[in-house]
Amino acid sequence: MTHKQRAIFEPTLVRTALLDAVKKLDPRVQWRNPVMFVVYLGSWLTTLIWLAILSGHTTGSAMFTGSIALWLWFTVLFANMAEALAEGRSKAQAASLRGVKKTSWAKKLSEARVDAPQEKVSADSLRKGDLVLIEAGDTVPCDGEVLEGGASVDESAITGESAPVIRESGGDFSSVTGGTRVLSDWLVVECRVNPGETFLDRMIAMVEGAKRRKTPNEVALTILLVALTIVFLLATATLYPFSVFSVEASQAGSPVTITVLVALLVCLIPTTIGGLLSAIGVAGMSRMLGANVIATSGRAVEAAGDVDVLLLDKTGTITLGNRQASEFLPAPGVTEQQLADAAQLSSLADETPEGRSIVVLAKQRFNLRERDLHSLNATFIPFSAQTRMSGVNVQERMIRKGAVDAIRRHVESNQGHFPPAVDDLVASVARTGGTPLVVAEGSRVLGVVALKDIVKGGIKERFAELRKMGIKTVMITGDNRLTAAAIAAEAGVDDFLAEATPEAKLALIRQYQAEGRLVAMTGDGTNDAPALAQADVAVAMNSGTQAAKEAGNMVDLDSNPTKLIEVVHIGKQMLMTRGSLTTFSIANDVAKYFAIIPAAFAATYPQLNALNIMQLHSPSSAILSAVIFNALVIVFLIPLALKGVSYKAMSAAALLRRNLWIYGLGGLLVPFVGIKLIDLLLTALNMG
């Protein structure tokens, strides 16, 4: 599945949105939006007054009252349609996800062995902890962890990426997702979720927004809008007795009608942002999905907009991530070939790019052929985040390679001595931005393998943009401080954490949060889970482990760590859109005030005609023009609410100034022009 962004006013979406907008006229739906609920009540009230005029139960202009009632209903419908369009785009995305989810069968195993007895069962009957065998051509029946085997898996149904990926037991690529398909070989998988709780089920629920809760900022803004609505409601309510008293005192004009007061109230309360607020939130999650990122809630998207510290893994995010062995640097008393032989032996079972490159370099330099570890009766020691080294035990030899501090501890624990000359070699490699990998055999240090990595093109400029926005970037790496400092300087990050362990990451996040900062990070391994759970915005890689995906509040389907920067941009754009439209909505009130107040009270107080600076044709056309503009502006702003305002990297103060000029001044001027044009049209049509 590819998450292609659909056109905002695509005919099928518009038709569905129109039907949904009418369905949302149900009062049980309307009361959830307090601002628009006031407009909804005003629509019913003016409609009843219009019917009373038609039936002769009261006096007044049926044409004027009916027109006001009609446009108030349009205001409610347009607000409903904005939300329905946003939800419609999400529902279309959910429908394509449902197409991926289909009934399949599973080979349930009694034990975690490929040759264990198996039973054919429906995938829907599988429970957490069940074991299944998945062979070439089979659909993965559940989300789970690979316990045995390795296979090529087609994940295009979930990620949109056509290239197959390798899933195998152990390491950070042991997670499989229900709905994907095994292309070759076999896997023994333990199911980690029950039916209805799979990643695909959660994706569908998230993008549908069926259980969308308001975010903290959305709640705060709603409280502000409700407060403004109450203030304007009280102010409008006092105008009726004031009008009656004024008419009696001056013996001129007539009291303001309920219809005019309702029109005034609707034009003064912040209906523009009130009608678009929900659509902005839904569209934010939809834009995140368009970037192939699944957010667990709008709360996560909003938090991304408030982030001011990014923790970025060096490998794959800042550098290309394909570090290659470039040189063997032997310790005193050791030949380069001896070092190459030991380094190659320790890397024969190492499937990392670094390990494979060491094997290749040893072949190229000294014609050292690969050896079969099984025939040598060798035991491979895999790398772990805790030991920060790997190696091999072969016959009487105990070879280890890893970070300088890890090898130092290993050598000293074996009563060995770490030569100062090797420290010099390590510093020399690190100063040039390379990564020194120290090799030792038993208690003897053999030397250093220099690994070279390349900083991604354009990454320095992206970090400069983030700095303009007030976001601090911190590089996380397992390299020593010298290497980390060299790469950090080249990439242009603000700070770095060298020789990082899972505990150090967690401590750093807590330190920043204690300072009142919001932290974002990415991760893919089980060892990243505690830090992901602690971070305010935690983007787990889809290729990572189940534990990492459960700990994060977002999942990147492309498994691209650099995506974190784009996630922050989308979050900030959503917050900016909400703020910009709020500014525009409140600024709108000024022009409507100049339109309606003179029209309502000039007959009693002729001096108020001085406020009719737009020279509107008549009181009725002035009021109707303001109400029509109030409804139409929602329609014109729907594309902006769904797409988001244009985003540029700059400081918060500069952004505020820019948006005040565009949306504050625009909100003041546009209604003057719009209301005057509508008044001219109504006059030309003899409706004023």
Swiss-Prot record:
Active site feature: D313
Entry superkingdom: Bacteria
Topological type in the membrane: Multi-pass membrane protein
Predominant localisation class: membrane
Reaction(s) the record says it catalyses: K(+)(out) + ATP + H2O = K(+)(in) + ADP + phosphate + H(+)
Binding partners and assembly: The system is composed of three essential subunits: KdpA, KdpB and KdpC.
Protein name from the UniProt record: Potassium-transporting ATPase ATP-binding subunit
Lineage of producing organism: Bacteria, Pseudomonadati, Pseudomonadota, Gammaproteobacteria, Enterobacterales
